[in-house]
Amino acid sequence: PRLYNAEKLEAVEPVIDTTSARGAVQYQDCYLVDNDSRFVFSFVRSAIEAGAAVANYVELVSARREGDRWVCQLRDTDSGEEFTTTARVVVNAAGPFVDELNTAWGVTTDHRIVYSKGIPLIVPRLTTTRHNRVLAFFDDTQRLFYVIPMGQRSVIGTTDTRVDDPHTHVTDEDRDFLLAQINARLDLPEPLT
């Protein structure tokens, strides 16, 4: 890690407003050269090479336990054709719908999902293109949020708002919160709006 005082921070990343900064820490982490979709595709390709059967545009209609196997009814979402397969293991990766599927499958757990909405904003690139630094700040609630370079854009975020329904949307409050946080921490020619 490298430690920077405010003066050095201003020199290495001039977009940061250093008027109230005491310093910064720079450390190396990983950088995903492609986007997350390419990363997932690479993961799926590795699974295929290891012998996995994979399918796209397939919906799980039902799953039930029979002995030491899962019997899964699937539907091709393009053709509507249904078919059955078996598996030793089923990974419930349904995100906010995990509890709903567990109930449908008769699976009980000690844990329940707590819904949280996280939104990012995508804006024109805010940092220099010379370095692909991810900037991390503490927001007014002391949560970390980031400015992540992505080509000619920057991704700012995310929020973390507790919600009761997984079907949610971005609100003006979400946008206003992130814009206020980033405008207070960067020295931009014009505030982001």
Where is each model-derived feature located?
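Flavin (FAD/FMN) cofactor-binding and adjacent substrate-gating region
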Residues: 1-45, 49-50, 55, 63-68, ...
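Residues that act as N-cap/strand-start positions at coil-to-secondary-structure junctions
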Residues: 48, 57, 77-79, 115, ...
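Conserved catalytic-core segments centered on acid/base and nucleophilic motifs
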Residues: 52, 90-92
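Conserved beta-strand-loop-beta-strand element in the redox core of flavoprotein oxidoreductases
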Residues: 64-90
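Active-site substrate-recognition segment that forms the wall
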Residues: 84-85, 92-193
